[in-house]
């Protein structure tokens, strides 16, 4: 019975090995529907699928048909986060190498599919707490793991089993606890010369800055988890600013022991750079960290 259920699930997935597509990363993001692209293809499909009774021109019966559409730009799109130029800057020279890429937080797997076709010789790993049935795709080089990033035991087992990665992309919780927990848990798994990417931190930072400003202007205390933003923290790492150690003494945030002095020592000793990048999209934000 279980084998029959699994067979039914996998038979409905889009087989990435059976699709021949362009190798341009932004086009792949648009085609598969990742919001990392300049245009958000998933939102177009979702929008017109809801309206298809009144829209005879939208002839795509399912997402596989949508992925295989011709004339990619002949549709109405919402603007995406425009991450492709940033990724291309760092990934272009290694796109044809055999590497290991891990994305943390994959939802239906549209970014995984894009990276699978872009890095056409590489192993692509994905982690998410959603059941594997929610993943739209399959491929011989694609590996998916149903893991909650806050489950320390499962994360330890995963990193022990799968060793180092050349690229790690955090696209999961987008808040302080999630971002810092992932950084601590996965930085050691980043290989020498590898890239650790943190996406979509800007909204959390702006929200926090406004809240701190409001309390200060009204002579009140800000009692959040910490008094720094994600952008501030990783800028301090890049500047090798040892004042970052003082952040560990802040309470109650660091009572959870997310960060430790020994971990920061490790980062300072192995970090080549940590740089933020933004596009003109209001929430587009990315930190690119390179390990020596």
Q: What name fits each language-model region?
A:
Residues 1-169, 173-198, 202-292:
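A short alpha-helical cap/connector motif
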